Each structure stands twice: as structure tokens, then as C-alpha cells.
Amino acid sequence: MAPIFKSLALVSALFAAISSAAPVNLDKREVDVVWTTVTTVVWTTIDVTTTIYPTPQAPTPPVVESTPTPTPSAAPEQAEPIETSTQPETTKSQPTQPSVATFIPVAAAAAAADSAAPIPEEPAPQPATTAAPSTSTTTQAAPSAPPAANSGSTEKAASSGYSGPCSKGSPCVGQLTYYDTATSASAPSSCGLTNDGFSENVVALPVGIMTDADCGKTVTITYNGITKTATVVDKCMGCKPTDLDASRHLFGELADFSAGRIDGMSWYFN
């Protein structure tokens, strides 16, 4: 029995040594690794202003409206009454024939009645020949009418740009500002044009008086004793009827840019 106890004692001592040597961590926990991905989204708002201009197709119709179309209709109307005037001329030639017939009995008493028959036949073609030049006079009267119509239209066209408000005799007085002209063909001015505002003297008329026919017209501007001429290429949406919006080059020739807006500017259409 003694050897068994000894072996048991040795085994228990061995287990005690092993248990004391092995660390015991009762509070040990599993370590969890957590990966966190943070995404930051930044929204940036950019204000973009787009100006939409109407298509500049209106200037062409006034050019197409030419006066030659009514002139051919007027020529035949004048030719018809003139042709009626030729008819009484033929009636006047007819009484001459019986006057010749009155001489026939005198010739019949002197000679034979048969010889008098060919005599009235000869004067018959004579009034026909006189009728021919009368028709030629009608052809001369017809072309004389169209120039009169054309002269009236040219007088109206010449007087249309020189009367009314903002004319040389009655110039408009208002404010003058400056703007950046249209330089891109994709966004032209209201007249369908692009201009270099840093080198050209151009203006925009007030929207209240601007028409398509004003595109390309020139105006004379006077301020502080300085007079300049500019071409109309655009319309100003915020201008009063007597104001103008000028290119930078034109404004710089009349005043300093620091003024921004000048009063007492007078202008008129040329």
C-alpha cells in the first residue's frame, strides 16, 4: 500500500505544480475588431443663369415685302380705261366716211357711179393706221404709273426714321448704363448679332420702343459736351423708354466706369 500512496502523492503534486504554473484568467473576453467606414457627401449648389433670346427671324419678312408685286396689277388697270378712250377715236373716224360718201354723188354726176365705190375703201384703212399709234400711246402711259407708286413708297421709307419721339428735332433725355454685349453665336443679341463690346460702339434700345426694324439703325448720343454715334444691336429689358444701355467701349468714351449710371444723356435716331 505504501508504493501506491507514494505514486498518488507524486501525481497530485504534479497536477498541483501544473495548475499553479498555468495562468488562469477568468475575466478573459474575446476581442472584437469593428471597422467603421464613414462617407462624407458634400453637395455644392452652383447658380447658373441662362438668358433665352427669341429667334431673330423677324427682320427678314420686311425685306421680302417689296413693292414690285402690286405694280403689275396696277398697269393693266390703267391700260383698260385708256383702251376705252381709243374707241371714241374710232367713232370719230367713222363720221369722216359719210363725209366722203357725200362727195360720191358729185363724182357720180360728173363721171360713173362705179368708180366711186373703190374711193371709200381707200380712206377706210387710214383710220385703222391712226388707231395704231393711239395704242402705242397707251403703252407709253402704262409704264409712267409704276414710278409714281415707287416714289411714294420711297418717300414713306425715307420719312419713317426721322419723325416721332427721339428724333433729331425732339431728342430723348434719360440715363445711360453699360452692359456686356453678346459674343457667342449660340446666344446672340435680340437682333441675332454678336459684337465686341470692348471695341465697338453699340447700344441696346429700351424694350418699350424697340422693334425688329430698329436693328442696324444708328443713334447719336451726347453727354457733357461729347457726341458719339452707335449702332442698335440689342434691346434693354430694364431700361425706361428714354434710357439706353451702351457697350463698355461707348460708355468709356462718354464717362468714367466708376459712375456706372449717368443722367442727362440725350440721344436721337439718325
Swiss-Prot record:
Region spans: Disordered: 53-97, 113-167
Source taxon at top rank: Eukaryota
Signal peptide coordinates: 1-21
Xref: InterPro entries: Expansin_CellWall, RlpA-like_sf
Compositional bias (Low complexity): 63-81, 127-149
Keywords: Allergen, Signal
UniProt cross-references to CDD domains, sorted A to Z: DPBB_RlpA_EXP_N-like
Ranges of Polar residues composition bias in the record: 83-97, 150-162
PANTHER family noted in UniProt: PTHR31836, SRCR DOMAIN-CONTAINING PROTEIN-RELATED
Protein name: Allergen Asp f 7
